[in-house]
Amino acid sequence: RRQRQMCIRDSTDSNDVSSVTQKAADFSDVVYIPTDNTAASNTEAIANILVPAGVPAICGEEGICSGCGVATLSISYYDLGVTTGKMAAKILTGEADISTMPIEYTDATPKYNPTICEELGIQPLDGYEAIEG
């Protein structure tokens, strides 16, 4: 059984994205990129390092995945807004107490980036939808 280690690398701004990504690629078989504005603004730079290195990225949201990742669990921000609005209405009308109200979620859709999957020779799992565009 192969031993796995976790390594956390973070980028504070766009000036260090390439060096942080290179360090992650050198150390990792796969990377996870959370939902992050710096990553979202630098997907091309990230892809230009990870793809040639053969390191797939699992991403925290569809926009980042469409630029540099292989897969994500995508949510609809519109649907999330509707759910949040309904929760707010319950609070404002007195139907719910914010301190005891359960958290509500929207469904996530498994999606993959067909271009990067093909470049890396990765076959997406059944049930994953291709990211369009």
Residues covered by each model-derived region:
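Glycine-rich, charge-decorated loop segments at or immediately adjacent to ligand/cofactor-binding or catalytic sites
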Residues: 19, 65-74
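Periplasmic-binding protein-like
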Residues: 28-40, 57-60
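Venus flytrap/periplasmic-binding-protein-like
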Residues: 42, 46-69
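Hydrophobic alpha-helical segments within soluble ligand-binding/sensing domains
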Residues: 75-96
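Hinge/cleft segment of the Venus flytrap/periplasmic-binding protein
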Residues: 90-133
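Short, small-residue-biased leader/transition segments that mark boundaries at the very start
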Residues: 3-8
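Solvent-exposed loop/turn segments at secondary-structure junctions
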Residues: 14-16, 36-40, 63-66
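Structural motif
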Residues: 12-24
